[in-house]
Amino acid sequence: MNPITSKFDKVLNASSEYGHVNHEPDSSKEQQRNTPQKSMPFSDQIGNYQRNKGIPVQSYDNSKIYIIGSGIAGMSAAYYFIRDGHVPAKNITFLEQLHIDGGSLDGAGNPTDGYIIRGGREMDMTYENLWDMFQDIPALEMPAPYSVLDEYRLINDNDSNYSKARLINNKGEIKDFSKFGLNKMDQLAIIRLLLKNKEELDDLTIEDYFSESFLKSNFWTFWRTMFAFENWHSLLELKLYMHRFLHAIDGLNDLSSLVFPKYNQYDTFVTPLRKFLQEKGVNIHLNTLVKDLDIHINTEGKVVEGIITEQDGKEVKIPVGKNDYVIVTTGSMTEDTFYGNNKTAPIIGIDNSTSGQSAGWKLWKNLAAKSEIFGKPEKFCSNIEKSAWESATLTCKPSALIDKLKEYSVNDPYSGKTVTGGIITITDSNWLMSFTCNRQPHFPEQPDDVLVLWVYALFMDKEGNYIKKTMLECTGDEILAELCYHLGIEDQLENVQKNTIVRTAFMPYITSMFMPRAKGDRPRVVPEGCKNLGLVGQFVETNNDVVFTMESSVRTARIAVYKLLNLNKQVPDINPLQYDIRHLLKAAKTLNDDKPFVGEGLLRKVLKGTYFEHVLPAGAAEEEEHESFIAEHVNKFREWVKGIRG
């Protein structure tokens, strides 16, 4: 008998639902209707009703939790074990191969040697799991009882994000970025993709499906540079992204739908979360390499009985009891990173024949060798020329580069407010180079006269316009020269180089999670038959969420905890805004460059002066009224349906 619920035993013992919660409901499969048999919330219902406390089915005072990897997924798992599973924090141990926690959420350096951030975070207000966690994590700089979310809201509510120079070309001229430039057939292709079932898209690439005109449109330039998609990446993942961010499509060109942190990703998220966990009592063992798991497999299931580690050069096996649990972060987007600086290019010590041998990938491969339920890691780590790119972090003292930056900034770069509002893409760059300056300082102890900029390029294997080398062959100074050329300040290059420290990072797997995939290539969070093992991170299957976000890492961690402990809680599916008629209508108009969509005039006529008039997108769609008004729009609608059906 559970002492927590003993007063409810009559109800619970008679319930067919108790102990059988669907922890990962799927909104793409659910018809939402209330019935006498329905007792749980709809699959994507969000809000405070979902904030009920988890009730453990047993005591975990003697259970040990081993979390392999201390990135955001692993840390989130620890948080949910503590908050919802009521597992004592002292029972939780991280096993981390590196000398520092945080995984891919890095941010380090100083003004003398230069700062480095391999990537950054473009955040969305609909990251329900991320904000669910960070509303409970004490703030980095505000006093108790304020949280990380409170800090995030405070700065973003009072400093709106937008870009005034999303695209530039012709040596620094701001290019018109007000239009998507999609023709009617390309708009219909997007709609057809949204209508397709996910099962139809196994192993298809974006260029398999979309036309050349789509791939040359402003829309695709906005999309690919914001999210780091390549033409050869997964069409399925692109579809999921379009559903996930449909509500934000009218902010795609000026980035006004984004909310950014005050500092870099490590100081904003990792530092306060790690501090919270350590104060609760979790154990973090750094420099501990996990090589394999000892899994007992029989007809009754799969049980982890040991963790094979390497510590101080010696193999050590950690026993795992039947009441213990193991969480593994599979794969890695930032392992095998190679670094360069002002005077040296990264020395790349990897190719397709040697890829996927680092710790995170090797562990996943060892699991996959035991059973097909653990997926196919080689689908993601075996083609690095299609999964890699290089970034550069610029630590800048005042120079001609900063003077030029001010022309593209919505606020003074030294004001602490939004600067570029996100990436600025150079459309005539052979490398398709983009750069950004987020709120400054980007590091808490950063000097007042220093700015930190970030640069990356999608076509790093192409010869530069100014420096006749590929980006990979370039030193930091040469990458800086290429940037200055595109900004029209190459004549002041000596001044810029003298005042700029460049640290580069080549990441062979940075978009490996975007590689084309099919059903079964990624394992489920709790693979079939696993009793005490959960897999988390960017390379596990969720119903409808996307990869390359902190939200998906937190989601997988939360699912793992709820499933393994069989808690009385669901992890709601992605925010349901994709089904909101307001956002669907807005998207239709936005894709058409704010010109009326088919049937808009009729809708405005029907809804004019009614309570629901406001659901229509902004902007009048005045059309000439005549006797055949309705017939004309019915015919247009028929043609539109024909187009969708292809």
From Swiss-Prot:
Keyword Lipid metabolism among record annotations: yes
UniProt keyword terms in alphabetical order: Detoxification, FAD, Fatty acid metabolism, Flavoprotein, Lipid metabolism, Lyase
Effect listed in the UniProt record for changing T436A: Large decrease in catalytic activity
Consequence of substituting N438A: Large decrease in catalytic activity
Activity's thermal dependence: Optimum temperature is 25 degrees Celsius.
Regulation: Is not inhibited by EDTA in vitro.
Cofactor: FAD
Gene3D superfamilies given in the database record: 3.30.9.80, FAD/NAD(P)-binding domain
Pathway(s) this gene product operates in, as recorded in its UniProt entry: Lipid metabolism; fatty acid metabolism
GO BP field: fatty acid metabolic process; response to fatty acid; response to toxic substance
Region described as Disordered: 15-48
Pfam families per UniProt: MCRA (PF06100)
Polar residues bias locations: 33-48
Domain of life: Bacteria
Record's catalysed reaction(s): (R)-10-hydroxyoctadecanoate = (9Z)-octadecenoate + H2O
Induction and repression of expression: Strongly up-regulated in cells grown in the presence of oleate.
Effect of H442A: Loss of catalytic activity
Top enzyme class: lyase
Function, in words: Catalyzes the hydration of oleate at its cis-9-double bond to yield (R)-10-hydroxyoctadecanoate. The hydration of unsaturated fatty acids is suggested to be a detoxification mechanism and a survival strategy for living in fatty acid-rich environments.
Similarity annotation: Belongs to the oleate hydratase family.
Subunit note: Monomer.
Protein's name according to its UniProt entry: Oleate hydratase
Organism: Elizabethkingia meningoseptica
